[in-house]
């Protein structure tokens, strides 16, 4: 189990670093948005490239932020059954949900979005807007984000199995109050 826990830790570290970068992307997206608006109103100049850059940063935040958010146990959840389960039952529910729903869905979506990226890359797809950006790099973010979320799912499965075997103590409880 130790090698698997080491793998889990490595995945967690990667997603923590991604989350750290995403924190700065929020600030960068806000600065780009505000600067673009101020320049447009002050000087009458606007750039589709800056607007698209802002969209790209938000897309990166969503796609890569999902794995970081999952690692931090901060995804929105419906706790109809979860609240009534013991801690062990919650671990089992997390394990089953991740193994049979999250990971397969992420891998399927990564697989289905890969040709979308490859086609854009093959033709060197550009924005249809004047002054717009290259499109294929942001299209790569879609399958990459789903792969990172699936990898975080693998990490969570490893941790849940270790916790069920008594080899690891994790706080699987969602810290926000339920409504």
Model regions and ranges:
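Alpha-helical transmembrane segments and membrane-interface helix-loop junctions
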Residues: 1-179
